[in-house]
C-alpha cells in the first residue's frame, strides 16, 4: 500500500516540478532524492527513446539538447548513450543530421548505441528507405565519439566488454510494421553467440517491442514486431542474461501501481529474457509517468542490472520507479 501511495505522490510532485522547477520545497522532498551510485558499477549508460526531432519545431531540438546537457553534467562517467529509435519525426535528412549534431556537440558519453525507428525508415517520403538507412550510417560513422565504423543500420558493438546488437527495419515498402531479412536474423544469432561465453549480460536494441511484452498488446495492438516477433524471440531465448531494449508504444515509466492495475510493467522478464520498454522522450506517455524527458540510467553490476528512472529534462530522479534485474 505504501509503495502505491509513494507512486501517486511521486507523480504529483514531479508534475508540480515541471511547472515550478526551482521550488526549494519540492526539490527537497525525499521522494525524488538521488541515492548515490553504488560501488562497483561496470557499465553506466543513459537510455532513452522516441526523440522525434523535427527541424521545423526548434523547441524539440532545444529539449533534446537540454536533456543531453543533464548527462554532460553527471558526476559519474557515462559510458554510453543509447537511443532506441524514432530519432526524427518524419525521417527527413535535415532532422536526422540535427539529431546527430546535437549529440555530437554535447560530449555527454564516450559511446553511442543508436537504433532507427519506424519514423526514421517507414515514414520516409522524400527518398527510398534504403537511402535513409545509408544516411543514418554515414552520420553515425562521421560523428560518433568512439570513432567506430558500421556498414549497415543493424550492427554490433562492445562497450566495456558488454555486447550490444542493434536491429532495424529492412523493408523497402513498410510503414509501422517492420520487416527483417534472413541475413539480419542470422546476424543477431551470431552476434549473441559470439559474446555468450563471456558470461556477461548482452543487450539488443530494437525500436519496436516483440509481441505481447511490456503491455504492448494492451497499449497498441499493432505496435509489435508482428511477423518478425517469433523469430527474434526464439533467438533471444537461446542465451542467458539478454536484455531487449525497445520504445515505440509511448508507454510511461511505471511500477507496481500500473502492474497491479493492468498486469504489465515497463521492465519484465519472460522466458529468461529481460524486456525493457522506454517512454517517448519528446511526447506524452501513457500508463505511467506521462510527461517527456524520461529515460533510465542503466547501471550494470556483477549481480544485477539496475534501471534508475530519471527525467533528463528536469534533472530529477524517480527512485520509486527503479527496477533491479538480477544476473543469473
What does each of the following model-derived ranges do?
Residues 51-54, 87-90, 118-123, 170-174, ...:
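Solvent-exposed loop/turn segments at secondary-structure junctions
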Residues 47-49, 81-86, 112-118, 204-206, ...:
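Active-site neighborhood of phospho(di)ester-bond hydrolases with catalytic His/Asp-centered motifs
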Residues 56-60, 124-132, 214-225, 256:
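Short, flexible/disordered intra-domain loops and linkers
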Residues 1-24:
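Gram-positive cell-envelope targeting signals
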Residues 174-179, 195-246, 254-260:
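Active-site-proximal segments of metal-dependent phosphoesterases and phosphodiesterases across multiple
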Residues 93-196, 231, 237-238, 254-283, ...:
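Extended active-site neighborhood of metal-dependent phosphoesterases/phosphodiesterases
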Residues 23-96:
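N-terminal active-site segment of His-dependent metallophosphoesterases
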Residues 29-31, 36-39, 289, 293-328:
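A short C-terminal boundary segment appended to hydrolase-like catalytic domains
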Amino acid at each position: 500500500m505504501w509503495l502505491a501511495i509513494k507512486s501517486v505522490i511521486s507523480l504529483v510532485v514531479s508534475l508540480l516540478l515541471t511547472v515550478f522547477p526551482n521550488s526549494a520545497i519540492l526539490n527537497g522532498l525525499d521522494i525524488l532524492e538521488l541515492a548515490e551510485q553504488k560501488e562497483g558499477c561496470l557499465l553506466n549508460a543513459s537510455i532513452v527513446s522516441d526523440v522525434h526531432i523535427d527541424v521545423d519545431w526548434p523547441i524539440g531540438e532545444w529539449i533534446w539538447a537540454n536533456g543531453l546537457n543533464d548527462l554532460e553534467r553527471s558526476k559519474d562517467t557515462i559510458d554510453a548513450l543509447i537511443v532506441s529509435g524514432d530519432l526524427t519525426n518524419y525521417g527527413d535528412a535535415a532532422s536526422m543530421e540535427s539529431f546527430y549534431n546535437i549529440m555530437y556537440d554535447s560530449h555527454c558519453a564516450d559511446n553511442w548505441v543508436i537504433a532507427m525507428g519506424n519514423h526514421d525508415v517507414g515514414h520516409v517520403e522524400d527518398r527510398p528507405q534504403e537511402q535513409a538507412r545509408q544516411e543514418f550510417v554515414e552520420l553515425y560513422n562521421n560523428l560518433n565519439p568512439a570513432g567506430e565504423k558500421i556498414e549497415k543500420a543493424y550492427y554490433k558493438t562492445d562497450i566495456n566488454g558488454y555486447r550490444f546488437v542493434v536491429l532495424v527495419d529492412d523493408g523497402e515498402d513498410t510503414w509501422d510494421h517492420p520487416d527483417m531479412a534472413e541475413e539480419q536474423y542470422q546476424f543477431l544469432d551470431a552476434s549473441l553467440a559470439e559474446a555468450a561465453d563471456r558470461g556477461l549480460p548482452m543487450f539488443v536494441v530494437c525500436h519496436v517491442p516483440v509481441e505481447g511484452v511490456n503491455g504492448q498488446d494492451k497499449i497498441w495492438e499493432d505496435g509489435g514486431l508482428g511477423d518478425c516477433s517469433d523469430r527474434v524471440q526464439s533467438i533471444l531465448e537461446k542465451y542467458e542474461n539478454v536484455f531487449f531494449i525497445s520504445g515505440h508504444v509511448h508507454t510511461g515509466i511505471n511500477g507496481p501501481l500500473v502492474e497491479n492495475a493492468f498486469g504489465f510493467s515497463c521492465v519484465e522478464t519472460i522466458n529468461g529474457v529481460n524486456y525493457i520498454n522506454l517512454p517517448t522522450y519528446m511526447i506524452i506517455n501513457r500508463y505511467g509517468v506521462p510527461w517527456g524527458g524520461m529515460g533510465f540510467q542503466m547501471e550494470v553490476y556483477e549481480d544485477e542490472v539496475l534501471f534508475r528512472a530519471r527525467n533528463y529534462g528536469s534533472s530529477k530522479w524517480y527512485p520509486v520507479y527503479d527496477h533491479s534485474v538480477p544476473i543469473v
